[in-house]
Amino acid sequence: MPSLPVREDEHGVLRVADTRIPLETVLLEFRSGKPPEAIVEQFPALKLEDVYVVVAYYLTNRSTMDAYLRQVEQEAQQTSELIESRFHNTAFLQ
């Protein structure tokens, strides 16, 4: 199998190949039922062969990758809660 086309950016985000597309975006699209061709169509910066390698890695390492996705989701939820707690203003809701 070719090496996993993933790199970590300066913020610690795992991105596919030389794109700005996060690994979790590709994985979530695949888990929602989209085939690699549809993912590339939606994100033209991706190469089909890179998406296939990412999907193959996911299928081979499902428990590890699902744990990664849970971690990313948890971090996103914590960030969202932090932002809401700092900037929540009911005046905007009226």
Regions found by a protein language model. Give the residues of each.
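Long, charge-rich, low-complexity alpha-helical segments
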Residues: I21-A91
